[in-house]
């Protein structure tokens, strides 16, 4: 079902002619009193209620917002399937600059729209929305995760996200070098924010050599002051050219692997927390042609979604960490499937996810 009454022609064209097809439901939301304009996209509920965050962003057009919601919802179906969750994929986008129009009234109105879906969609934080925002949304909608601990939530998910990426690195090491240990391996991390700085801690604890960069020089300085063994370089271009780099971890913006970076990348493995690391589908073949092993981003960075899903059942950190530790086995299985089928790891991950969704019991 798609609610389309009064939708502009370009929005309808995006809905029905997108190459990200197959969505079960798309809801266009508007609340004039608060200024809310939003899109909720449910790609699949085959595995269970759709789970995915709410992005608050100043899209150039409503059609662009719809296209982003469709793409992100589809991605969440695959991420949740590979994380072993009993959840399908969904995503919501709120149109507008959060610095200008975000208000309690708007978030409450949004919560009412999510609640109207009766549990088919469970929301959480994403770009432009935060724990405090989810606390407000939850006042109107019980299908809300990513809340503060004071309001029954789990809070910051960066700890488990970094732990999952770390497990992905260990799996890549096992596959490529026959040993999961990262001791004496050189790992370059681009982006040492909430996730990246936790990743630094995991790697140092195991005895890895760590090289970092970030556009925020004060953040880099804080890390090198705490850990004098960490080496800082000027920018990502310098990082990907570091001699004897074993693993490259993009942990900032998407599109880090592109036609400019892949030809000069010195690492043997790419495994990081950033979303949408491949600038276009052909990039993974370029990596394979250079003998670089790619750990699919949506598989290794699933620690965060594992946490918000667990919140629905009463958050337990140890239970979540045990689930996130399985990212190691999942990543190994992807590498094995890729080798068996003669395809890149990202394509292998997609096949495994699609198989799990296809085998799931259809839900009304």
Curated annotation (Swiss-Prot):
CDD domains hit by this protein: NAD_bind_Leu_Phe_Val_DH (cd01075)
One GO term of the biological process aspect: valine catabolic process
Gene3D superfamilies xrefs: Leucine Dehydrogenase, chain A, domain 1 (3.40.50.10860), NAD(P)-binding Rossmann-like Domain (3.40.50.720)
pH-related activity note: Optimum pH is 10.5 with valine as substrate.
One GO cellular component term noted in the UniProt record for this chain: cytoplasm
Activity regulation, free text: Repressed in minimal medium by the presence of glucose and NH4(+), glycerol and NH4(+), or glycerol and asparagine.
Listed name of the protein: Valine dehydrogenase
Organism: Streptomyces coelicolor (strain ATCC BAA-471 / A3(2) / M145)
């Amino acid at each position: 079902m798609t609610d389309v009454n009064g939708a502009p022609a370009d929005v309808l064209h995006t809905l029905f002619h997108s190459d990200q097809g197959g969505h079960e439901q798309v809801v266009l939301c508007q609340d004039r009193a608060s200024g809310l304009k939003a899109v909720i996209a449910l790609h699949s509920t085959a595995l269970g209620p759709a789970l995915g965050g709410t992005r608050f962003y100043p899209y150039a057009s409503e059609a662009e917002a719809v296209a982003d919601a469709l793409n992100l919802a589809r991605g969440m179906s695959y991420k949740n399937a590979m994380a072993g969750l009993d959840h399908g994929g969904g995503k919501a986008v709120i149109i507008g600059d959060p610095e200008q129009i975000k208000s309690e009234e708007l978030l409450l109105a949004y919560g009412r729209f999510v609640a109207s879906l009766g549990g088919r969609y469970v929301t959480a934080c994403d770009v432009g929305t935060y724990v405090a925002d989810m606390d407000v949304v939850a006042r109107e909608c019980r299908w809300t995760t990513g809340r503060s601990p004071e309001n029954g939530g789990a809070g910051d998910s960066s700890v488990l996200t970094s732990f999952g990426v770390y497990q992905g690195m260990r799996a890549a090491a096992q596959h490529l070098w026959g040993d999961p240990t990262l001791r004496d391996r050189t790992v370059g991390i681009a982006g040492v924010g909430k996730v990246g700085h936790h990743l630094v801690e995991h790697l140092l604890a195991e005895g890895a050599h760590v090289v970092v960069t970030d556009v925020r020089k004060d953040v880099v300085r804080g890390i090198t002051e705490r850990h004098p063994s960490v080496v800082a370089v000027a920018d990502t271009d310098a990082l990907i050219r570091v001699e004897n780099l074993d693993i490259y971890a993009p942990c900032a913006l998407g599109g880090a692997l592109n036609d400019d970076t892949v030809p000069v990348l010195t690492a043997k493995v790419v495994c990081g927390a950033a979303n949408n690391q491949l600038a276009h589908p052909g990039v993974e073949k370029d990596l394979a042609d250079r003998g670089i092993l790619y750990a699919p981003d949506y598989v290794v960075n699933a620690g965060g979604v594992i946490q918000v899903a667990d919140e629905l059942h009463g958050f337990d950190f140890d239970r979540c960490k045990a689930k996130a530790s399985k990212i190691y086995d999942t990543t190994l299985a992807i590498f094995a499937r890729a080798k068996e089928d003669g395809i890149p790891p990202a394509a292998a991950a997609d096949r495994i996810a699609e198989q799990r969704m296809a085998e799931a019991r259809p839900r009304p």
